Amino acid sequence: MPLTDEQLEHYHREGYLVATDVIPERYIHDLQEEISSVIDEQARKLYAEGEITELHEELGFLHRAAELSKESRNVIGPVNGGSLTRCAMFNLLTCPEILDIMEQFVGPEIIASGIYRIRPKLPDKPEGIVPWHQDSGYFDTCADEHLVPTCWVPLMNATIEAGCMEVLPHSHKQGVFRHYKANLHAPPLAVHPDHLPDTEPVPVPADIGDVVLMTNMTPHRSTDNPSGLIRWAVDLRYNAPEAGDYGPGEAGFLARSTKTPAQVFTDWREFDRLRKEHVPQSKADRVWLKYDEETFLDPSKRADKPFPKLR
């Protein structure tokens, strides 16, 4: 179901929106099963190689990878980030209910960005704590004048305790803030504290079927996960062709089109082949300084220092 006028107004005013009951349950279930299958394949491989000593077959989707990862972080490698290129991942990327909303944002010509990510946020692990950043901080500058919506899709009920997303509302119309490369286990890019908007953070818990919608300029972060569960989520990005190749390291594809419908990807095997055969032509052209090269008015506010949790 498309967004209402009120929802669209909230998104454009605040820079985010939690749209409830968007994704049919089968898309989430199928992706959970696909991830579980890949985790099982990897666990058996590592077990045969002697890298892990237990398979933990009795555990389910929200627990098994966490237990396996206590012996080897290589367990989640085949599903982490943009690694997964199988059928259920493709089906979620091309979910009609998501594309209907994206058409409201970017028009009828829709590129599914190559920068999609599966996020297995393990409990009580520092690499799951992601600092304040804007997606455009990672992008090539060609996208700076374009809307690149993010769809953050929980694969479990993402509560505050499990480390749901947090946003800085109505801070998305000031362009790309200065970022730096923080000294973190997590993806290190962080908004420079001297440039961080003085805005009260808002946690955005979401349930299965919901989508947290953000702009590419919306500052957001993720805190720790003491829930004991893996906070599984996927973030997807879409854009009009005019936004350009802002993530040249990874291949996106045409997900919907009225102009060239024959070029729309309809088979996951096309998607899988595209991802595996893609040869990056260049890197994003935006450059940020490392934490030990930057200057800070108040070093205690660096993102690689402990920050307060919204509880």
Predicted regions: what they are:
Residues 1-14, 20-132:
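Non-heme Fe(II)-dependent double-stranded beta-helix
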Residues 9, 158-221:
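Double-stranded beta-helix
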Residues 41, 211, 218-311:
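Non-heme Fe(II)/2-oxoglutarate
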Residues 58-62, 130-135, 185-198, 230, ...:
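Short, surface-exposed loop/helix-turn segments at secondary-structure junctions
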Residues 106, 137-148, 199-200, 206, ...:
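A short beta-loop-beta micro-motif enriched in histidine and acidic residues
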Residues 108-111, 136, 141-144, 154-164, ...:
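Active-site region of the double-stranded beta-helix
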Residues 121, 168-175, 231, 237-242:
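Short edge-strand/loop segments of extracellular domains
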Residues 140-160, 205-206, 213, 237-240:
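Short, conserved beta-strand element in jelly-roll/cupin
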